[in-house]
């Protein structure tokens, strides 16, 4: 039996500027369910992730373009033009299996091709990151598997709980003398930042300050996510790119400085956080979205000397240790917080695989009020009867 398949392809490298639909193709093919190798599974995608980190993958100078960006899988990459299958995080369901660890109808999340249907052979399963979502989601909320229960959730969980390590305030069960620590979150209305702020507030009792673009998002992070303060970066101005004004606004809501900064942006946000960082302050770095569209990456300079006697710490990290359950129990904790309404995932949906390029472009549009939380491309799934009617050629 053959199942029709659609796949997102990158036409060629996009070294600078905002990528758009003109840079991608949606190509049709089919996947055969016959003669599956031992250990293989077939995954039908329900949701495709749309993430800022993929911007780096489509640049010529990204070293991942010289080999597979998916953990050792075989992907045809034209290193001269950059033409390749796009890949990232996918949530779906197992529709055929010759692997004892995976049953038909299991829900799965993982790093895969952006295809509606695909075979994961044993070598691919062993090389990539996959996690079982069965028991945590159902067909109605499987998109959480690429959001709060996927890479963004693991990034928020790992960066906050294990890297920044907030001290629980007395108000949420911490030591009686522990006052709330202050956290500054960049890209606060995004997939990761929105979760970071909610966890910090509801689980640790922190004072949470968020920066995001536009009045709609700034109102949302306070009214819906529970942030204490919001800073609209789109209103910053000045010859220094708004750095002095950001310093002033941050000081107005955190006159005694900040204890923690969750970094996803870079640029003036990082500089303002360093200026406001208190002794024993911590910074967790998961991304620098302000630089992703530049042809050449450039990063902030750090005054290392000032950090020594202030006992400050900066740590970069990625989500994989928590997705692989090498650190903590991310799925258990996050799913519990969702059930307890301590975390309310926010999602923005685009319908159909054809919309993936437009959804990706939306990540980089300054002050885009229509986008908040996790951006997800939902894929219409054929019914079981439709699959049965699909004949082998």
For each predicted feature, which ranges?
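Eukaryotic N-terminal low-complexity, Ser/Thr- and Lys/Arg-rich leader segments
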Residues: 1-30, 35, 381-393
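C-terminal capping/lid region of NAD(P)-dependent oxidoreductase domains
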Residues: 2-4, 342-349, 357-393
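Hydrophobic beta-strand signal
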Residues: 8, 42, 108-109, 184, ...
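Glycine-rich beta-strand-centered segment in the early N-terminal region that forms part
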Residues: 32-50, 57-114
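NAD(P)H dinucleotide-binding glycine-rich loop of Rossmann-like/cofactor-binding domains
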Residues: 78, 84-93, 101-187
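Mid-domain Rossmann-like dinucleotide-binding core that forms the NAD(H)/NADP(H) cofactor-binding site
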Residues: 146-240
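Glycine-rich cofactor phosphate-binding loops and adjacent beta1-alpha1 units
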Residues: 167-169, 173-178, 224-225, 229-314
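Glycine-rich phosphate-binding loop and adjacent beta-alpha segment
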Residues: 204, 221-222, 268-343, 379-393
């Amino acid at each position: 039996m053959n199942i029709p398949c659609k796949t997102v392809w990158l036409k060629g490298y996009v070294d600078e500027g905002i990528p758009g639909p003109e840079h991608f193709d949606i190509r049709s093919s089919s996947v055969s369910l016959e003669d599956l190798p031992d250990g293989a599974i077939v995954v039908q995608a329900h949701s495709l992730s749309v993430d800022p980190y993929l911007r780096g993958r489509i640049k010529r100078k990204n070293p991942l373009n010289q080999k597979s960006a998916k953990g050792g899988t075989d992907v045809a990459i034209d290193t001269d033009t950059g033409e390749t299958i796009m890949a990232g995080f996918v949530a779906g369901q197992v529709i055929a299996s010759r692997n004892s660890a995976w049953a038909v109808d299991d829900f799965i999340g993982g790093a895969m091709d952006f295809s509606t249907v695909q075979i994961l052979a044993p070598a691919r399963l062993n090389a990539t990151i996959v996690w079982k979502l069965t028991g945590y989601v159902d067909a109605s909320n499987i998109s959480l598997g690429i959001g709060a229960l996927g890479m963004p959730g693991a990034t928020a969980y790992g960066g906050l709980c294990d890297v920044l390590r907030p001290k629980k305030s007395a108000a949420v069960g911490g030591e009686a003398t522990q006052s709330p620590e202050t956290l500054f979150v960049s890209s606060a209305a995004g997939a990761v930042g929105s979760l970071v702020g909610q966890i910090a507030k509801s689980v640790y009792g922190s004072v949470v300050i968020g920066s995001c673009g536009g009045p709609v998002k700034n109102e949302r992070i306070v009214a819906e996510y529970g942030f204490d303060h919001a800073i609209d970066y789109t209103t910053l101005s000045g010859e220094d790119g708004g750095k002095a004004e950001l310093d002033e606004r941050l000081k107005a809501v955190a006159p005694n400085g900040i204890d923690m900064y969750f970094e996803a942006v870079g640029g003036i946000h990082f500089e303002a956080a360093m200026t406001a960082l208190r002794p024993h302050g911590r910074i967790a770095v998961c991304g620098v979205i302000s630089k992703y569209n530049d042809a050449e990456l450039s990063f902030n300079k750090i005054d290392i000397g000032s950090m020594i006697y202030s006992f400050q710490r900066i740590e970069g990290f990625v989500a994989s240790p928590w997705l692989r359950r090498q650190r903590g129990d991310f799925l258990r904790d996050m799913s519990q917080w969702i059930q307890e309404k301590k975390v309310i995932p926010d999602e923005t949906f685009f319908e159909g695989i054809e919309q993936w390029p437009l959804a990706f472009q939306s990540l980089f549009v300054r002050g885009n009020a229509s986008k908040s939380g996790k951006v997800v491309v939902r894929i219409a799934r054929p019914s079981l009867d439709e699959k049965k009617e699909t004949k082998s050629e």
